[in-house]
């Protein structure tokens, strides 16, 4: 299923991890993303309750999930978990999900936080911002989600 988004669509992005999920928010009109929060990944119930609250608050039109891969592009153990998380987001919240190769997003996030003197404990949310910004930067003028 493909859904065209309005030019001012709001997006939520996720950097999925076993212990924490970084979340960022962005907008198609401004093509900018910002780190939002870190959701503790305690268990499935807590994870989706917290994400549901974010979706209710920000009312995104679509979601973006970082896809972890080895440097050579091969999948690894977290790849399947992130895919499952994104598919569950789509199933639970009926929002289109797009995937972004997240290789080096955490490295870029740490470097950006250090350069700005920000707290290192925000790295997961900053990684989600990097993922979403990469997604926004790669969009043509008119984008359709799958």
Curated annotation (Swiss-Prot):
EC numbers: 3.1.-.-
Pfam family of the protein (one): RuvX
Annotated localization: Cytoplasm
Top-level taxon of the source organism: Bacteria
Gene Ontology annotations for the cellular component aspect, listed alphabetically: cytosol
Signal peptide bounds: none
GO biological process: rRNA 5'-end processing
InterPro entries: RNaseH-like_sf (IPR012337), YqgF (IPR005227), YqgF/RNaseH-like_dom (IPR006641), YqgF/RNaseH-like_dom_sf (IPR037027)
GO molecular function annotations of the record: nuclease activity
UniProt entry keywords in alphabetical sequence: Cytoplasm, Hydrolase, Nuclease, Ribosome biogenesis
Similarity annotation: Belongs to the YqgF nuclease family.
Function, in words: Could be a nuclease involved in processing of the 5'-end of pre-16S rRNA.
Record's protein name: Putative pre-16S rRNA nuclease
Organism of provenance: Burkholderia thailandensis (strain ATCC 700388 / DSM 13276 / CCUG 48851 / CIP 106301 / E264)
Lineage of origin: Bacteria, Pseudomonadati, Pseudomonadota, Betaproteobacteria, Burkholderiales
């Amino acid at each position: 299923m493909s859904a065209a988004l309005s030019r001012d669509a709001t997006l939520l992005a996720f950097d999925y991890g076993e212990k924490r999920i970084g979340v960022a928010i962005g907008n198609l009109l401004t093509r900018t993303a910002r780190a939002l929060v870190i959701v503790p990944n305690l268990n499935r119930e807590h994870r989706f309750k917290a994400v549901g609250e974010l979706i209710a608050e920000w009312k995104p039109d679509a979601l973006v999930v970082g896809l972890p891969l080895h440097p050579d592009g091969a999948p690894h153990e977290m790849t399947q978990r992130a895919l499952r998380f994104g598919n569950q987001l789509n199933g639970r919240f009926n929002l289109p999900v797009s995937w972004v190769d997240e290789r080096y997003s955490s490295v870029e996030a740490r470097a950006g936080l250090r350069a700005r003197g920000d707290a290192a404990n925000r790295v997961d949310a900053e990684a989600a911002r990097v993922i979403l910004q990469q997604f926004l930067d790669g969009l043509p003028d008119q984008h359709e989600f799958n």
